[in-house]
Amino acid sequence: MKCPFCGGESRVLESRPASDEEAVRRRRECLACGRRFTTMERVEVPPLIVVKKDGRREPFNRDKLLTGVLKACEKRPVPMEVIEKLADDIERDLRSSLDREVPSVVIGERVMEALRQVDGVAYVRFASVYREFKDLNEFREQLEQLLKSR
């Protein structure tokens, strides 16, 4: 690696995992000027693309996922740590699949399944928006399914 001070080559003095365990911290020394510097090495993750219902494609946005879950959990006794973990788990699962393109339907279904485990009311709220319930009968059917599964 080139020295940021003089452009000369450097050697690695020390390597260790960074505090987040997702990077490697390397202490380096320039062979030309002798100055020391630190670099961080991370795996470059290819972008995850969401394919919308109308065929449009957009980059995965964790904040959109989190906003939807937060809205469903509004005024419910669901700790923020649980919501964050839910979003982390869904994102990790999506990124671990071999597909770089994920239909929005898959994301919605995973959110509903996760919310079903966390809080029934949050699940029904999310489902009513996600599945675009048109009347009370659709709402009732979803509630009945939830009650049967418990």
Curated annotation (Swiss-Prot):
GO biological process: negative regulation of DNA-templated transcription
Function: Negatively regulates transcription of bacterial ribonucleotide reductase nrd genes and operons by binding to NrdR-boxes.
Name of the protein this chain belongs to: Transcriptional repressor NrdR
Sections of the chain in a coiled coil: none
Zinc finger (unnamed): 3-33
Domain ATP-cone: 48-138
Species of origin: Symbiobacterium thermophilum (strain DSM 24528 / JCM 14929 / IAM 14863 / T)
Cofactor note: Binds 1 zinc ion.
Xref: Pfam families: ATP-cone, Zn_ribbon_NrdR
Any one GO molecular function term: zinc ion binding
Entry keyword set: ATP-binding, DNA-binding, Metal-binding, Nucleotide-binding, Repressor, Transcription, Transcription regulation, Zinc, Zinc-finger
Entry similarity comment: Belongs to the NrdR family.
InterPro entries hit by this protein: ATP-cone_dom, NrdR-like_N, RNR_NrdR-like
Cofactor(s) needed by this chain: Zn(2+)
Statement: the UniProt record of this protein carries the keyword NAD: no
